[in-house]
């Protein structure tokens, strides 16, 4: 990071908030806490416009998030992208109206000149939220682990499931897309558990179920 590129009070405040999540004092300089539930960059000012990001709430031991299913899927699919695509990721996360993928692409030009440090901070925040969802909550069974240098294919599976749920009668595609992401993941989790149970009941062994679902045998045993 180059300190001279950090300009403006808002940029410094956001960086300070994110620094609380970075473990660097007397420890490995490269170790970052990228697994937490918090919205550390709730607003972003670009020119004369104020953009509000998604919200995360954990009151009463209940997790909610304002992101819609399609909004989360689009943003998750961009994690690990090149710096040039970060304005699109930010446009998705800070979209001001009813979300559409097309609208986010149009809005992305608004964020092209935003300080790269801020764009990366927003990306880190969303990455940490996603990591928490798929490693520290009941949604961990949706996280398909591959080799360490292979990005999990969950975003592809989630996108396909939009149409599967619509075909199952849960509503048209637009209704499913606008569903709150936590509700959407809850349905996917339920469907996956039902599939594992059904495969077990027809006599498939654990290895076969693992091959078909991508779940570890340990996870399958926990479900059954």
Name every feature range the model reports, one short phrase each:
Residues 1-202, 207-224:
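An amphipathic, hydrophobic-aromatic interaction surface with interspersed Lys/Arg
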């Amino acid at each position: 990071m180059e300190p001279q590129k950090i300009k403006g009070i808002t940029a410094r405040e956001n960086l300070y908030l994110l620094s609380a999540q970075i473990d660097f004092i007397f420890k490995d300089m490269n170790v970052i806490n990228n697994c937490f539930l918090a919205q550390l960059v709730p607003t972003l000012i670009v020119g004369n416009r104020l953009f509000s990001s998604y919200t995360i709430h954990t009151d009463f031991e209940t997790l909610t998030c304002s992101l819609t299913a399609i909004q989360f899927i689009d943003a998750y699919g961009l994690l690990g992208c090149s710096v040039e695509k970060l304005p699109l990721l930010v446009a998705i996360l800070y979209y001001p109206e009813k979300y559409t993928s097309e609208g986010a692409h149009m809005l992305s030009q608004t964020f092209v000149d935003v300080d790269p440090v801020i764009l990366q901070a927003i990306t880190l925040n969303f990455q940490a939220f996603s990591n928490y969802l798929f490693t520290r909550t009941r949604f961990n069974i949706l996280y398909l682990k591959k080799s360490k240098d292979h990005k999990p294919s969950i975003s592809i599976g989630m996108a396909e499931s939009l149409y599967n749920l619509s075909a199952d009668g849960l509503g048209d595609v637009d209704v499913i897309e606008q569903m709150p992401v936590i509700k959407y993941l809850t349905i996917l989790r339920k469907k996956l558990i039902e599939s594992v149970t059904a495969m077990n009941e027809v006599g498939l062994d654990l290895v076969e179920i693992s091959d078909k679902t991508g779940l570890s045998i340990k996870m399958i045993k926990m479900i059954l």
